[in-house]
Amino acid sequence: RLFAETLEVLKKAWTEKFFSHAGEFYTYPHPNHVWQHDMSPPSEEFMNMKDNTLKKISIVPKPYQSPHPPIHQVVDGIRSIEWAAQNEINVIMWIPTVKALKIKFEAYKNARSEKEKKNVPLGEGVSLVRDMFVADTMEEAREKAGEHMVNYMKWVCHWRGLGNHMDPGEDLPETKRKLDLLNYDFLHKRNMLFGTPEYVIDKIHE
């Protein structure tokens, strides 16, 4: 609810000359705020002229794009993917495997198509982040960047666990600690573009 209301406020600020908002989490402008500024003459556009309280506020400068810049939301679960599509928000995905991404791409396509009442092409409105390191050989990529990538993912997965790295329906063997399986070989085949130019190109086409 907080995110949805934040988005509502943002769109108002971008698209209206002066705006007000009274919601569950936010109220703009602050109630009964008296406005007095020598360089900003009073105006009924944004003030109650009887008591000099603000009725509306504005932002400057306004966005260059009309009605506003494209909005992108980082998503993971199907619920957030469908919510973004239903609100005509582009999405950004990161860690999931190709098999998992295909399900997520389809979910976004279907929800966006339903919202716009047309067939939205698969992949439209979706951005994908992938970690990449290109080298002359596969061994060189591993030697120069592999350890750093694993350490980075250990930091990320400390809270998240390994669920985002798994294929749909995949079961991982039980381990003493939740990140015992997290190594270069585990990551590389799932979502890393580390290797020769040819390898990276093939993975992109995948």
Give the predicted meaning of each segment:
Residues 70-71, 193:
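A generic secondary-structure micro-motif detector
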Residues 74-105:
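A conserved active-site cap/scaffold subdomain adjacent to cofactor or substrate pockets
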Residues 71-74, 89-93, 124-131:
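Hydrophobic faces of well-ordered beta-strands that scaffold small-molecule active sites
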Residues 2-62, 99-205:
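An alpha-helical appendage that flanks or caps ligand/catalytic pockets
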Residues 63-70:
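A local structural motif
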